[in-house]
Amino acid sequence: MSRRYTPLAWVLLALLGLGAAQDCGSIVSRGKWGALASKCSQRLRQPVRYVVVSHTAGSVCNTPASCQRQAQNVQYYHVRERGWCDVGYNFLIGEDGLVYEGRGWNTLGAHSGPTWNPIAIGISFMGNYMHRVPPASALRAAQSLLACGAARGYLTPNYEVKGHRDVQQTLSPGDELYKIIQQWPHYRRV
């Protein structure tokens, strides 16, 4: 009798696993971190094949309160100083292990120049990673976000991760973070 239920058990396990893969974890909404209203209107065509990882090269944040302030600072710089329609990144990663929604999955970013912005999601780690690595919680948050994006169809199943320095002349995402993302399974050199 237990053999009769074995296929059903496998189907149940598969469905539960799929549900877990689609869990986007802790994404802090724009409203929760106090974002200014976006003035962006250009949509990003999905699914997206590329993800560009950068760092803000700014202050570190390691608590939800400090990361919310840092996300506001980044947005302020992009909107007020650079004249952009919003924060340039689709998502920001805090050292508190949380993902902060920037432009999100559906809006064209301003993170990697005119060639890559229309075809890539931009994820930026808040902090400077030239000489130190982000904490494991931040790296896990980024990996979880990418798995979610692929599971929900925002990213192609064979999406490719690039470092910011792979697509533009820059030191971003910092030497130490760059070493780490080169080990990620979806990393591909240009």
From Swiss-Prot:
Keyword rRNA processing appears in the UniProt entry: no
Location in the cell: Secreted; Cytoplasmic granule
GO molecular function terms attached to this record: Hsp70 protein binding; molecular adaptor activity; N-acetylmuramoyl-L-alanine amidase activity; peptidoglycan binding; peptidoglycan immune receptor activity; receptor ligand activity; zinc ion binding
Gene3D superfamilies: Peptidoglycan recognition protein-like (3.40.80.10)
Domain annotation N-acetylmuramoyl-L-alanine amidase: ranges: 46-174
Pyrrolidone carboxylic acid modifications at: 22
A cellular-component GO term for this protein: extracellular space
Alphabetical list of Pfam families matching this protein: Amidase_2
Tissue expr: Synthesized only in bone marrow. The mature protein is stored in the cytoplasmic granules of eosinophils and neutrophils but is absent from monocytes, lymphocytes, or platelets.
SMART domains in alphabetical order: Ami_2, PGRP
Disulfide bonds: 24-148, 40-85, 61-67
Keywords attached to this entry: Antibiotic, Antimicrobial, Disulfide bond, Fungicide, Immunity, Innate immunity, Pyrrolidone carboxylic acid, Secreted, Signal
GO biological process: antimicrobial humoral immune response mediated by antimicrobial peptide; defense response to bacterium; defense response to fungus; defense response to Gram-positive bacterium; detection of bacterium; immune response; innate immune response; killing of cells of another organism
Signal sequence extent: 1-21
Subunit structure: Homodimer; disulfide-linked.
Protein family (similarity comment): Belongs to the N-acetylmuramoyl-L-alanine amidase 2 family.
Described function: Innate immunity protein that plays several important functions in antimicrobial and antitumor defense systems. Acts as a pattern receptor that binds to murein peptidoglycans (PGN) of Gram-positive bacteria and thus provides bactericidal activity. Forms an equimolar complex with heat shock protein HSPA1A and induces programmed cell death through apoptosis and necroptosis in tumor cell lines by activating the TNFR1 receptor on the target cell membrane. In addition, acts in complex with the Ca(2+)-binding protein S100A4 as a chemoattractant able to induce lymphocyte movement.
Matching PANTHER family: PEPTIDOGLYCAN RECOGNITION PROTEIN, PEPTIDOGLYCAN RECOGNITION PROTEIN 1
Protein name per Swiss-Prot or TrEMBL: Peptidoglycan recognition protein 1
Species in which this protein is naturally found: Bos taurus
Gene: PGLYRP1
